[in-house]
Amino acid sequence: GMPEIQRIIIEQRSPMTAKDISRKYNQLTRPDWENRRVQIMRWALNGKLLYNWKTFGELLDSTGEKYIVEDSPKDTFWGAAKDGNIYSGVNALGRLLMQLRLQYRRLNKQKNIILKPPQIENFSFLGIPIPAILVDVTNEPYGANIHMW
């Protein structure tokens, strides 16, 4: 939903500016966001990996078997807050990145990978339903301004 707001946000050069603009529209967040946010973030991270296969994939792989933690004292759902030597929180982003690391290792020898949209009602971008996307992961770099729609 809200293609005009999505367009304003993606036109920003600064991620922080985009985030600040998005906060003005918090009341328009999808009603099912709390139940769908992990599914949507998984899809977004998969897209990030597929379009940055070598650089992002190698970065993930370089972490070995270490835990990945989003150090975030303010958001203990996506991250975890450090208290001394202990982190407490859900660390959903860190967990998703560790899953992505395994996926990268499993798929690393493939050339073409399909990114399927999550099975979510009204999952669209700029008013267009998000389709499955076939990505040639050997064709990097794509550039910072790739637009899939």
Language model region names:
Residues 1-149:
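Charged, low-complexity intrinsically disordered segments
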